[in-house]
Curated annotation (Swiss-Prot):
BP term (GO), one: valyl-tRNA aminoacylation
Keyword Ligase attributed: yes
Chain positions of motif 'HIGH' region: 47-57
Record's protein name: Valine--tRNA ligase
Sequence similarity: Belongs to the class-I aminoacyl-tRNA synthetase family. ValS type 2 subfamily.
Organism: Methanosarcina barkeri (strain Fusaro / DSM 804)
Catalytic activity: tRNA(Val) + L-valine + ATP = L-valyl-tRNA(Val) + AMP + diphosphate
Protein biosynthesis recorded as keyword: yes
Subcellular location: Cytoplasm
PANTHER family in alphabetical order: VALINE--TRNA LIGASE, CHLOROPLASTIC_MITOCHONDRIAL 2, VALYL-TRNA SYNTHETASES
Pfam families according to UniProt: Anticodon_1, DUF5915, tRNA-synt_1
């Protein structure tokens, strides 16, 4: 195949479209049967199907695909499943918007159907993007959490954990979003610093400071520090709450900070978690002043029906009018927000379903898992250490997995579904047996499960839990973002331990977030959002994947920059040019020829390259084993561009175009081995490009090939040292030609090399010169031939007379000026007057004479190169 038969420009869109059509995706399928290969199951994150497979998703899936493709090549039976985490509030809100309804205006089943239809369409859109990016997903193991085949497992896990006493139902303070009208877990609370006011209020015996005056209606005690002498005389006495009139006790507790505000604080039900702690500790009464919609209740008296903000404003005004409010000060406060809608959360006491948390067991399991990077484990440890409440798993929504529970109307007992009844929606089907009290009348549980109850069993699902297959837990790896360590990672470990008593995975690899070109988190409001489709349309999927590979080390945040994609696209063209050149010289040379080739006919520079190539394979293997994608790809790119293209190809052109068949054969062998190996090394990262290269070398897919093995016999330090010297000598000769304005292929009469025992053939070809290795030391005579005045010194000193000084210098012989300079001063006559100059005022150009010839001399790492022009 000649260069003219291969297009000069690499057409990425054409190549990628071709292979998307040609690839048989069954080559990515996991074998559930007996298989001699070790399993490698990936607990893939199931994204929320918004219809937009955003760039953060795409980066994570690049990482997953790098691993999946690499592990297949390493001989593993790989499962790269694809899941979709369907349930949740955003879909409900979108359905209401699309259909112009609220969820309560249509039957529950009809609303769920609308949600399912929207979700199915969104999944189709996202699936197309994933295919376009070349992800080697095992679509035979796709799962969709809203499908009965999946949520039956969610329900089954609930039933088993309930029967094992992991799950319970009781009224308890919970985080509540008034806008979403649902409970949320602590892991779903995000915090933001906001400005508020600290209000100073007279009570009848003490003054308190509060940021929540609207909660005075729910004040059940006042607390001070026992060491605070200002209030010690009042501890145990009753105090009347202004405006609302209830009498509360003043208690002493060590958690009160005397320096904050007045040193006296209200205990309300509930302003924050500290209120809950005190409420439990002192068995205080419960006053519900805020309802589920964020409105004030009857307990607030005349403020009933007001929103929280309206009530706060009204109470402050009334306190001021009555003379109770005596000061207000600005305060920065960390406010807990709902992760979905950014509404400040409230803590309400509501009956909910909870999962018990065993912090010690979770920490022990986390220690059994290998974390990449290791420091990310600290995030899980820190989060676990702050857990005070059990996991609230019930939600007051519709589009989610139904809780398989009924409540007996007669005795109030809970009826939990039997596993054989599942999947089931208790709002659509009654229990298949009577209650223990004999009653057959039940109230269905209308709450649904937290979506994390669906996604926290993905590790179980993909390893065959409750299926026709044998359980293969633990999975080998969980790839995920650092933002969901406290949710998805935490809950998955909890559930795996509760249901199977095992860790969910052997390893967890954490990826960072994608930042916009401006360095900020991508958001529509900032106008810095880039979609994967935008990149693939403008450049290519392989260019996008390269950006993902080199953007940052594992766990770090990655900035999207167009210049990185441009650089990636240039590398594809560079590799294509390397391949095009190589293939033009491999006509008639294939795998059979490579197998028959006798390696003892290799030149030093061939051994140098093959040694470097095998070191590259060794490095890439070790780095990928540690999920270091950036360093792996940079090493491959550096080898291809700097070692192969910039040096080896230039050095062997003489042999490839020459008439030495044995030397040419050796170069062909190296080109074949190197091109094929690079195709394999690039396959996990840029699968379309690698397939295009490999298809010209083999009828098989590169993605069904084994990862290249390191040939230790070809790693040769002596060859590398000699090759480096050859490379550097050739580089210096090329630089020499460039500085003289010569063409790089311009002929030189001869190169004489001293102090080097190297193969000169490839230097001769690259330099277009005869080359001789010389014995002994070179003998040089340096003859001064020109005096160059330093006008930087002469100009400022002599000004208008500088020309006369230059003329006087030129009148002297270069040898005479050199001799004077050696003595420390130079004297010249200008208009009959002697002028003294420092040696730095001139530069003496010398010619090098060797053997009676004018030559140029280069020194390269101890070797001396004499150039005869």
């Amino acid at each position: 195949m000649t260069e003219s038969e291969i297009p000069k420009e690499y057409n990425a869109s054409e190549v990628e479209e071709k292979w998307m059509d040609k690839w048989d995706l069954s080559m990515y399928h996991f074998n559930w049967g007996e298989d001699p290969r070790p399993q490698y199951i990936i607990d893939t994150p199931p994204p929320y199907p918004t219809g937009n497979f955003h760039i953060g998703n795409a980066l994570n899936w690049c990482y997953i695909d790098f691993v999946a493709r690499y592990k297949r090549m390493r001989g593993y039976n790989v499962m790269f499943p694809q899941g979709w985490d369907c349930h949740g509030l955003p879909t409900e809100v979108k359905v209401e918007e699309i259909h112009g309804i609220t969820k309560n205006q249509v039957p529950r089943a009809e609303f769920r159907k609308m949600c399912r239809e929207l979700t199915a369409g969104n999944i189709d859109k996202m699936r197309k993007t994933m295919l376009r990016l070349g992800f080697s997903v095992d679509w035979s193991n796709e799962f969709i959490t809203m499908d009965p085949s999946y949520f039956v497992k969610t329900q089954k896990s609930f039933v088993r954990m309930y029967n094992k006493d992991y799950i319970y139902h009781e009224e308890h303070p919970v985080n509540w979003c008034p806008r979403c009208e649902t409970a949320i877990a602590f892991a779903e609370v995000e915090y933001e610093t906001r400005q508020t006011k600290l209000n100073f209020v007279h009570f009848d015996k003490v003054d308190i400071a509060t940021t929540r005056p609207e909660l005075m209606a729910a004040c059940v005690a006042v607390a001070v520090n026992p060491e605070d002498k200002r209030y010690s005389q009042y501890v145990g006495q009753e105090i009347t709450v202004p405006l609302f009139g209830q009498k509360v006790t003043l208690i002493a507790d060590e958690d009160v900070e005397p320096e904050f505000g007045t040193g006296a604080v209200m205990i309300c039900t509930f302003g924050d978690k500290q209120d809950v702690r005190w409420w439990v500790k002192y068995e205080l009464p419960l006053i519900k002043a805020i309802d589920k919609q964020g409105k004030m209740t009857k307990a607030a008296g005349k403020y009933e029906g007001l929103s929280i903000a309206e009530c706060r404003e009204a109470v402050v005004a009334d306190l001021k009018a009555a003379g109770f409010l005596y000061d207000q000060k600005p305060l920065e406060q960390n406010v807990g927000l709902c992760w979905r809608c950014d509404t400040p959360i409230e803590i309400l006491s509501e009956p909910q379903w909870f999962v018990k948390i065993d912090n010690d067991a979770i920490l022990k399991a986390a220690d059994e898992i290998k974390w990449y990077p290791e420091y990310m484990k600290v995030r899980l440890q820190n989060w676990t250490g702050t857990m005070e409440w059990d996991w609230c798993i019930s939600r007051q929504r519709i589009f989610a997995t139904p809780i398989p529970i009924w409540h007996c109307k007669k005795c109030g007992e809970v009826m939990v579904a039997e596993e054989s009844w599942l999947p089931i929606d208790p709002n659509e089907a009654a229990p298949k047996k009577a209650c223990a009290c004999g009653s057959t009348e039940f109230e269905p549980e209308t709450d649904v499960l937290d979506t994390w109850m669906d996604s926290s069993i993905t590790a179980l699902h993909v390893t065959g839990w409750e299926s026709e297959h044998d359980l293969r837990l633990p999975a080998q790896i969980r790839p995920q973002g650092h933002d969901i360590i406290r949710t998805w990672a935490f809950y998955t470990i909890l559930r795996s331990l509760a249901l199977e008593g095992k860790r969910p995975w052997d390893s967890i690899v954490i990826n960072g977030m994608v930042l916009g070109p401006d360095g900020h988190k991508m958001s529509k409001s900032l106008g810095n959002v880039i979609s994967p489709e935008e990149v693939t349309t403008k450049y290519s999927a392989d260019a996008f994947r390269q950006w993902g590979a080199v953007g940052g080390s594992t766990g770090s945040d990655v900035m999207f920059r167009w210049k990185d994609v441009v650089s990636a696209s240039r590398f594809l063209q560079k590799m294509w040019s390397i391949y095009r050149f190589s293939m033009s010289h491999l006509k008639g040379f294939g795998q059979e020829d490579a197998e028959k080739f006798q390696k003892d006919s290799l030149h030093i520079i061939d051994r140098w390259l093959l040694s470097k190539l095998n070191r590259l394979v060794d490095t890439a293997t070790k780095e990928l084993d540690d999920y270091q994608f950036d360093s792996t790809f940079k090493a491959i790119r550096g080898f291809a561009w700097e070692v192969l293209a910039d040096n080896y190809l230039e050095l062997v052109k003489g042999r490839l175009y020459g008439d030495d068949p044995e030397g040419k054969r050796a170069a062909q062998y190296v080109l074949y081995r190197t091109t094929k190996t690079l195709s394999l090394l690039l396959a996990p990262f840029i699968p379309f490009f690698a397939e295009e290269l490999y298809s010209r070398l083999s009828d098989e897919s590169v993605h069904t090939q084994a990862w290249p093995a390191v040939d230790e016999s070809l790693i040769n330090e002596e060859a590398e040292a000699a090759g480096e010297l050859i490379k550097e000598i050739t580089g210096e000769v090329r630089r020499y030609k460039s500085e003289l304005g010569m063409a790089l292929n311009a002929p030189l009469k001869k190169l004489e090399i001293y102090n080097a025992d190297i193969d000169t053939g490839d230097i001769a070809g690259a330099a277009n010169s005869k080359v001789e290795l010389m014995e002994g030391a070179p003998s040089f005579e340096y003859v001064p031939v020109e005096v160059k005045p330093n006008m930087g010194i002469l100009g400022p000193r002599f000004r208008k007379d500088a020309g006369a000084v230059v003329k006087a210098l030129k009148a002297e012989s270069p040898a005479a000026i050199e001799a004077q300079a050696a003595s420390g001063k130079i004297t010249v006559n200008v208009d009959g007057k002697p002028i003294e100059l420092e040696p730095e005022a001139v530069e003496i150009r010398k010619e090098v004479i060797s053997g009676g010839r004018e030559v140029d001399v280069l020194e390269v790492r101890g070797a001396v190169v004499v150039i005869v022009r």
